[in-house]
């Protein structure tokens, strides 16, 4: 038997008081005046025996009453882990693992699941005694900063009060790993885990990273699992928002794909999906979803402004709100700075005319220089660089660095370009080299034609009104460099001999277009064909555009801020809640990538240098957190077995008094009520016996 208040057991000494009183009464002499003969006659031996028996019974009852009362106040239990006879003498180290992921924001008839878990944790704190210590781990933050133990119940309670549903997801196993690290540093004999979670399916552990914890999770460790699932939850979520368009222009449509999933166990009709651009609703679609069904819905929206554009898709409210929006952003360029380097100024004439056509007159800001001046210019100031020629170029390394850092390049031969110089340029850039020059420059006797065109490439989007068009009219090609992509790129327009007329290549973050015939009339009549102007415009817009993460960064995960090629002393990050972070940088880090760690909220993070927005990063919730399927007890037991847990596991019902249930699980069933009841019954019996004994004593005395 274990006593929760063993100090009260010193009260057992009080049981000696009735005995001492009884012994004292035996020594007390009572004078009775009567004659010996009269006494002998009146003496009733049987009555004397009865009186003495009742007195012994009274003595026993009084001793028992005192013993029972002392035991009741000492709070005895039937079972427990006794250390030196009493469990409460040993100090306890406890770790509270509270699931604060947004699946715990579900509301039932007792309030939100998270608020119920917080209330239970604060109730459990009341069981802690002087010298006990505890730590609080949030599932959403289990991969973040270190958590320390505290002996202050007030501090822990404040931390619990501050918990709000998080957009971050997390694995319970990661929290367990951190809790094990904490317990391994504790010298206290009693060690406990409290896991307060809905035990969502798929969020317990990754089977590939399970650890072995038997050295810490030994027989003395107790795990209390409090499960808050049980309600049938109605939830739909947006799992993905994909941008299908890759070239963005003002007043032009942008196509999106929205993936919506019905996580519920019942079908839902007429699910409305709204598309917002800069917080303005611009499109809606609807769909019917069966239980567990996902659908990809296409939405098209016209962009009416330039710069970074905030985009999100939204569905109507359900029982889990945090997965009802999905964010992304696009960049619509305006006044794109480009620079053109040529061997001969006239070689870029048709390209310039195409870029300054009436519709696009204000789109490009063009600088034109000689090819031998490449090394004198800061290419980082330009969104795209056009190289027409190769004869006077001596800065291929600089062009390569520009492309690696994300710049867009278009390279084409010029009127003076020969095979050797073109091969040298492309080889130094790490691109495929041409094998030969085909045809005769200026000759129009042998004509070469396009064989095929990849009309699915972004440069052809919105060019043709006929969506079923599969081929473009080929210009007459008089001369071109025979070049195969060699597996390093993608041929956009292919010649009849299988070589690439126009191809796309990548150097890390940069895009490169190779046009293998000069854009002048002595090489081809391409510049006077109708496809030339839109293709050149789309190509430069495509090269100037930047790859977006498309919202694949999940809340809580770090993301990179690319400042390569920029001289930046300070960055400002405007978070989705409009709070601001400032990041000071050393000038020598101008070519670095800054890792940003405060991505706890979903939405778009704006990156600024001064007042200029240089990037926008979209952060979204993990779709795995939207599931409304939950683990069974057996799943939890199997997990603990896999990590070699040797202690005791208790499943507690959240409907009961959690604090009392833990005391019962920790120390056994308390018997103080039973002891108190028996003491009261014996007190009543003692009263009856005492009255009867008094009566008998009077009769004997007569």
Where do the language-model regions lie?
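Acidic, S/T/G-rich, low-cysteine, solvent-exposed domains in lumenal/extracellular/periplasmic regions
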Residues: 119-122, 187, 201-225, 232, ...
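DG-centered beta-turn motif at the end of beta-strands
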Residues: 5, 69, 93-101, 117, ...
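Juxtamembrane linker/hinge segments adjacent to transmembrane helices in membrane proteins
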Residues: 1-71, 652-664, 695-702
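Beta-strand-rich binding/interaction modules
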Residues: 251-288, 295-299, 307-316, 561-586, ...
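Von Willebrand factor type A / integrin I
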Residues: 6, 163-164, 178, 182-186, ...
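…and closely analogous acidic/polar surface helices at protein-protein or active-site interfaces
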Residues: 81-92, 102-133, 151
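Short, charged loop segments at secondary-structure junctions
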Residues: 104-107, 142-174, 218, 228-231, ...
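Membrane-embedded catalytic interface detector for glycan/lipid assembly enzymes
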Residues: 370, 506-508, 516-523, 528-683, ...
């Amino acid at each position: 038997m274990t006593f929760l208040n063993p100090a009260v057991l010193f009260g057992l000494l009080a049981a000696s008081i009735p005995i001492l009183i009884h012994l004292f009464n035996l020594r007390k002499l009572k004078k009775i005046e009567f004659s010996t003969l009269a006494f002998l006659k009146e003496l009733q031996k049987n009555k004397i025996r009865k009186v003495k028996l009742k007195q012994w019974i009274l003595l026993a009852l009084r001793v028992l009453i005192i013993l029972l009362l002392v035991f009741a106040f000492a709070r005895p239990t039937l079972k427990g882990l006794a250390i030196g006879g009493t469990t409460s003498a040993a100090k306890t180290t406890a770790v509270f693992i509270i699931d604060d992921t947004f699946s715990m924001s579900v509301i039932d008839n007792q309030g939100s699941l998270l608020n119920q878990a917080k209330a239970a944790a604060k109730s459990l704190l009341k069981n802690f005694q002087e010298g006990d210590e505890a730590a609080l781990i949030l599932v959403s933050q289990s991969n973040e900063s270190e958590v320390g133990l505290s002996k202050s119940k007030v501090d822990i309670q404040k931390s619990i009060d501050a918990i709000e549903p998080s957009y971050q997801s997390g694995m319970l196993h990661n929290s367990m790993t951190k809790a094990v690290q904490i317990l391994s540093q504790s010298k206290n004999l009693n060690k406990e885990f409290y896991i307060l979670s809905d035990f969502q399916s798929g969020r317990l552990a990754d089977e590939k990273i399970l650890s072995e914890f038997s050295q810490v999770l030994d027989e003395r460790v107790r795990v209390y699992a409090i499960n808050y699932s049980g309600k049938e939850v109605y939830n739909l979520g947006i799992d993905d928002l994909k941008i299908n368009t890759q070239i963005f222009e003002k007043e032009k449509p942008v196509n999106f794909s929205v993936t919506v999933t019905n996580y519920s166990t019942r079908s839902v009709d007429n699910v409305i999906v709204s598309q917002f651009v800069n917080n303005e609703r611009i499109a809606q679609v609807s769909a019917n979803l069966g239980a567990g069904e996902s659908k990809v819905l296409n939405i098209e929206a016209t962009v009416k402004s330039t710069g970074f554009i905030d985009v999100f898709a939204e569905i109507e409210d359900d029982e889990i709100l945090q997965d009802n929006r999905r964010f992304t952003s696009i960049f619509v360029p305006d006044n794109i700075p480009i620079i053109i380097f040529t061997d001969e100024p006239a070689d870029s004439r048709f390209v310039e005319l195409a870029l300054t056509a009436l519709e696009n007159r204000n789109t490009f800001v063009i600088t034109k220089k000689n090819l031998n001046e490449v090394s004198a210019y800061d290419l980082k100031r330009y969104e795209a660089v056009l190289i027409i020629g190769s004869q006077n170029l001596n800065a291929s390394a600089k062009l390569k660095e520009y492309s690696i850092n994300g710049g867009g390049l278009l390279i084409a031969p010029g009127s003076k370009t020969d095979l050797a110089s073109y091969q040298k340029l492309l080889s130094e850039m790490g691109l495929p080299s041409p094998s030969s020059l085909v045809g005769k420059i200026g000759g129009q006797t042998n004509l070469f034609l396009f064989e095929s065109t990849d009309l699915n490439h972004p440069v052809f989007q919105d060019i043709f009104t006929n969506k079923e068009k599969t081929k473009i009219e080929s210009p007459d090609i008089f001369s071109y460099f025979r070049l195969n992509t060699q597996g390093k790129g993608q041929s956009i327009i292919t010649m009849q001999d299988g070589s690439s007329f126009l191809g796309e290549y990548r150097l890390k973050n940069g895009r490169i277009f190779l046009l293998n015939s000069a854009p002048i009339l002595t090489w081809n009549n391409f510049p006077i064909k109708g496809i030339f102007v839109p293709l050149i415009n789309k190509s430069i817009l495509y090269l100037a555009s930047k790859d977006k993460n498309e919202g694949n960064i999940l809340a809580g995960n770090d993301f990179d801020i690319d400042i390569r090629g920029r001289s930046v002393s300070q960055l400002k990050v405007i978070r989705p809640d409009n709070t601001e972070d400032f990041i000071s940088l050393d000038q020598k880090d101008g070519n670095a990538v800054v890792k940003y760690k405060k991505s706890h909220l979903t939405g778009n993070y704006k990156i600024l240098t001064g007042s200029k927005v240089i990037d926008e990063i979209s952060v979204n919730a993990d779709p795995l957190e939207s599931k409304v399927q939950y683990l069974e007890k057996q799943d939890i037991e199997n997990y603990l077995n896999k990590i070699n847990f040797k202690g005791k596991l208790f499943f507690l019902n959240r409907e009961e008094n959690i604090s009392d249930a833990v005391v019962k699980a920790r120390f056994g069933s308390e018997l103080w009520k039973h002891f108190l009841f028996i003491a009261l019954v014996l007190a009543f019996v003692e009263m009856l016996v005492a009255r009867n004994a008094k009566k008998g004593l009077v009769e004997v005395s007569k």
